[in-house]
Amino acid sequence: MRTHRLAIVAAATVAALALSQPAGAQQRPLVTEDPEPIGAGRILLEGGLDLAHNQEYPASGLEGNLVRFPTLGLSFGISSIAELQFDGGLFNHLSISNRNPAPLAYLLTVTGDGTHDIEDLVVATKVRLKAEAAGSPSMALRFATRLPNATNESGLGLDTTDFFVAFLAAKTVQSVRLVGNIGLGILGDPTDGQRQNEVFTYGLSLARATTDHAEIVGEINGRVSTRAGEPSPGTESRGTLNIGGRYTRGSYRLDGAFFFGLTPVDPTAGITVGFTYVFTAFEVP
């Protein structure tokens, strides 16, 4: 029933987007990465607030409502075709509603009805391989490493280092900006340091402008475990449907979106709001 409802919402989102005007290459509140870099010598700063209902942590067994604030992103345009990215957050708080049996539950130092930690830092590089042309999409590669900043003891971290590589493509067709990602993630097993799990990553987003300043956006983004049988906790398949909008004035942009989990371990629903500021900061030789 839940999958059926989400399919209806996704179809309605695509239909609504198909009635608007095109949008350029932008990011928040979307997760699917556009292959276009921000430009040589430019810096992109973004921040936001996420509220997630029924967030699960299979490795620690904790479950509850999650607040992430602030979520932060910082990108540097190191050339006309390359971008260096840092994404993370300063404070994650989980209001615990359930404690389920889990392999790493014995490591928890949480005694009350809440726990908090920082967000794992993701360091990434995006390199555009081909600019968009009349008859072909723009293309890029993105390499990312997720560092183990959040801890097992808080129940919010896995203490693993993960690596991702993805192929990015985008095309503006008439009034539609369509972006697709496909890639591979190598996730450390939090229960056994000698093992890992490979996941297939995917993302598909659409964006349309309703006015010169406002857009509506939507996407499906997630990962699929490739391991035969039950994957290690924390490396399972995940997916999210995002529906939202953006409003841009000059170098500033405000955004907001509702998101819905596509798997049993994803949050049932949630909301994200944030801002983006882009400016020219330095010259690239």
Language model features: what each stretch is:
Residues 20-22:
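N-terminal signal peptide c-region/cleavage motif recognized by signal peptidases
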